[in-house]
């Protein structure tokens, strides 16, 4: 556990396990032998409140009965409603769209709302995502990290605009190009890729796969007037694309199956070429 410069707490527990880790989505998987409806599940939940001086990190165990279609999100809500109203965790959409419920599930970052309890039980250990500032228990401030990263990368279209004309039609775009941009825009900023990243766990200024993916998205956009030289000034160092160690934990855990491996390799190749000019 470490302290941030502004007094926040970042908790680093349970490193990502690339090999032999349980599945973290609701894709069809075979449940472990013996996990069936009516069986008791044991949830070992990391508890810690950085705002309470008396609080210390510890695992707290809860038991719930397995029910059909129970996700970890459903289980956590049941724990909070019936067993412990003080338990903190995040959620919004419950459909794998907002990314709020991301956490470390049996050592692997994933979304609670897209993980079936039967796929990771009967013994389930939950912890907050590392790297991000801890709010309490399973709740972390991914928004603060993502905002700082986006502002640093200037993650918006840079357009040499004349006077604003609300009557002018939007510029046309080739449908195939629009689809390529949309593919990268599917990122939900859940933070799973950052938490699975070895570099991000070692240096706080690394932009992670989510940042490199943003650069790849705007580089595709014909409305953005920036050049590779401009992008090199932003990500052409060890805190940017050259900090990636190619462990590809990010690619393994992305709940939206984004082509992170391809985009990281592509952007790094372009930045190497730019740096050699």
Question: Which residues are covered by each model-predicted region?
Answer:
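Short, Gly/Pro- and small/polar-rich lid/capping loops
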Residues: 2-33
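Short structural boundary motif marking the start of a folded domain
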Residues: 37-43
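Short strand-turn-strand beta-turns centered on an Asx-Gly dipeptide
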Residues: 46, 57, 104-107
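Short, contiguous acidic and Ser/Thr-rich linear segments
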Residues: 58-71
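Ferredoxin-type iron-sulfur electron-transfer modules in oxidoreductases and energy-metabolism complexes
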Residues: 69-85, 124-277
């Amino acid at each position: 556990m470490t302290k941030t410069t502004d007094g926040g707490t970042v908790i680093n527990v349970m490193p990502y396990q690339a090999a032999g880790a349980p599945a973290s989505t609701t894709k069809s998987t075979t449940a472990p032998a013996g996990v069936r409806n009516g069986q008791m599940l044991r949830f070992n939940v990391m508890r810690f409140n950085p705002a309470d001086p008396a609080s210390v990190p510890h695992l707290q165990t809860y038991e719930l009965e397995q029910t059909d279609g129970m996700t970890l999100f459903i289980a956590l809500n049941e724990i909070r409603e019936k067993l412990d109203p003080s338990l903190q965790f995040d959620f919004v959409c419950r459909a794998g769209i907002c990314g709020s419920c991301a956490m470390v599930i049996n050592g692997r970052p994933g979304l609670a709302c897209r993980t079936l309890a039967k796929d990771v039980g009967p013994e389930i250990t939950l912890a907050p995502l590392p790297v991000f500032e801890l709010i309490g228990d399973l709740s972390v401030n991914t928004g603060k990290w993502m905002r700082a990263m986006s502002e640093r990368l200037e993650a918006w279209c840079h357009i040499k605009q004349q006077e604003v004309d609300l009557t002018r039609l939007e510029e046309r775009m080739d449908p195939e190009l629009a689809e390529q941009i949309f593919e990268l825009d599917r990122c939900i900023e859940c933070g799973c890729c950052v938490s699975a990243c070895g570099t991000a766990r070692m240096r706080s200024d690394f932009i992670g796969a989510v940042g490199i993916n943003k650069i790849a998205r705007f580089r595709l956009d014909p409305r953005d007037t920036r050049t590779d030289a401009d992008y090199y000034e932003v990500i052409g160092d060890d805190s940017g694309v050259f900090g990636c160690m190619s462990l590809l934990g990010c690619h393994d855990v992305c709940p939206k199956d984004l082509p992170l491996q391809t985009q990281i390799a592509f952007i790094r190749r372009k930045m190497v070429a730019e740096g050699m000019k």
